[in-house]
Curated annotation (Swiss-Prot):
This is Cytoskeleton protein RodZ. InterPro entries: Bact_Cytoskel_RodZ (IPR050400), Cro/C1-type_HTH (IPR001387), Lambda_DNA-bd_dom_sf (IPR010982), RodZ (IPR023690), RodZ-like_C (IPR025194). GO terms for cellular component: plasma membrane. Residues 147-180, 189-214 have a biased composition (Polar residues). GO terms for biological process: regulation of cell shape. Residues 133-338 are periplasmic. PROSITE patterns: HTH_CROC1 (PS50943). Keywords: Cell inner membrane, Cell membrane, Cell shape, DNA-binding, Membrane, Signal-anchor, Transmembrane, Transmembrane helix.
Amino acid sequence: MNTEATHEENAPHTTGERLRLAREQLGLSQQVVAERLCLKVSTVRDIEEDKAPADLASTFLRGYIRSYARLVHVPEEELLPMLAKQAPVRTAQVAPMQTYALGKSRKKRDGWLMSFTWLVLFVVVGLTGAWWWQNHKAQQEEISTMADQSSAELSQNAANSPQSVPLNTDNTADASQDQATPPADLPSGDTQNTASNNPQPTPVPSSNTASQQPVVVPPSQANTDTAAQQNTTQPAQSQLPVGQASTAPAADANALVMNFTADCWLEVTDATGKKLFSGLQRKDTNLNLSGQAPYRLKIGAPSAVQIQYQGKPVDLSRFIRTNQVARLTLNAEQSVTQ
């Protein structure tokens, strides 16, 4: 009876004492236990002194005590009553889940996003419209300036050009009248044959015609001379078209042909700096220019003109797409440069 009471008094009352006694019976130190359990020595000391660290949750503390008990061969059933007193399991208080209006917040966020998107879109459209209007206004001002310059140049050229003086045609009329009058001494029949068979003589000044005296020719000699002149005149007349064809000028290889489908302001300058044309060209008209290549062109409305250079059309589509004043150079190799 006394032995059982003594045994109960000597029995440890806490988990820390029970684990410390078991460790000492195995001859282990706190350092060895800490190394085997991968814990700090201070944590092992707190467990043996029944201290619960403030920064350590009860769940972790119960796990450390169970690991310590397995290491020193102490049954867990022996430690459970003491463990329940030392590190009671705290029931987690689960707070009721608050319901959030996710749909409303999402709609609100989407509304802000859409508003920002529309704002950016309006800004981009406004900037694009302002840029286009500035370019259009600048082009119109440039076209009006060029038209004013061309009008001033045309008026200045008209003021500086000399007035045309009519030619005196009295001497020519007298000469033609003298040549048309036949000599009075010739017979009428021979005169008609001579006038019909002989080629028309080259006109000479009226003073020489008036000073010459008519020559009387016998009828037989007049007929002979007329036949001879007729025979010699026919080969010369047959060779005349060949000579005219051989002397016809060749077409200009640098010819510039422009057809206008609407009113268009135009300025064309050749390689020497000479302005071949500068002014307003009306609808349904064409313009043929010739000069020294390359040509420098400035066209106010590229969509209103069709250009052919060296017999080939010139592409103006890039200027038509951007709706801007066309500035280009046509060189001898049929290439277009801006």
